[in-house]
Amino acid sequence: MPPYLVDDPIVRQELAHYYSTVRRADDAVGEILAALQASGEADNTLVMFLSDHGMPFPFVKTQLYHHSTLTPLIFRWPGIVQENTVDDVHMVSAIDILPTLLDSVGVQIPKGIQGRSLLPLMRGESQDGWDRIFKEYAENSSGERTPMRAIETKRFLYIFNPWSNGKRRMTSATMHMNTYKRMVELAEKDEKIASRLELLTYRVVEELYDVQADPDCLVNLIADPKYQKELTDLRFLMATWMRETQDPALNAFNSRAEPKALAEFMTTQNLGAQRRREWKHAIRDSLRKANTEKVDAPERVEPVPTQP
């Protein structure tokens, strides 16, 4: 059992169901690769497999924790990628996919494109500058705005949660799962689970984890005096990246110790989210109306020609 989940029979059963879906995905990929081989184009095809971010469980899905973004990225390209090799040294991100695909077909990468080509790494080469990644989260599929930013190095993970004020609750599809519901039940009698549930629901403005010693992100080191230098360095890198990417959350980050500034930022964020929801709902309602009118419209009957 992953330590960030509750070890409980109900949770174990749901986790087993997830592992079953992973096996079915593996079966499907096998069928695709077999069809590719049968086509005769396998040696001339770059195959890329990238997982969605995180299992659909609490503390993983719709989060920026270590296991939320530690996903498989697999390449198959005969003659370029050596078989049965694993690169666990370079830290890469999804923004590197587009530059990689452009580079692989000989297209010059346009200026302003974020990310770097992974082609040298795929060839087994070693490069500098792959020692950190930045992460972003904005809102869930329902348009509930809970923006987060994070930077992860090979040793530490720093997370900034501007939405967290001790009252606002985070909503996620994981809350409809049996695992979450079981956590709620167990939290009534277990203080440790209750504490974890509170963190999941309300979070805190800043989090810091030693992902080498604590990859499950169970101990927040944000107030630990032993890690203040590392925290300062990570905050500096975060601010630099946010400036470079023109992140609208930069002012909130610089004012992270001021609840009023964070509240103003979230007011703007929620207003934008509300406008997007209204826009999406208007499109949805328009399509529903059009489909209804199409169904209700009388069917046109063409006249049958008759003999004079």
Residue ranges and their predicted role:
Residues 1-98, 102-112, 167, 172-206, ...:
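Active-site-proximal cap/lid insertion segments
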Residues 83-89, 106-116, 128-133, 159, ...:
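Acidic/polar loop patches that form or flank catalytic/metal-binding clefts of enzymes
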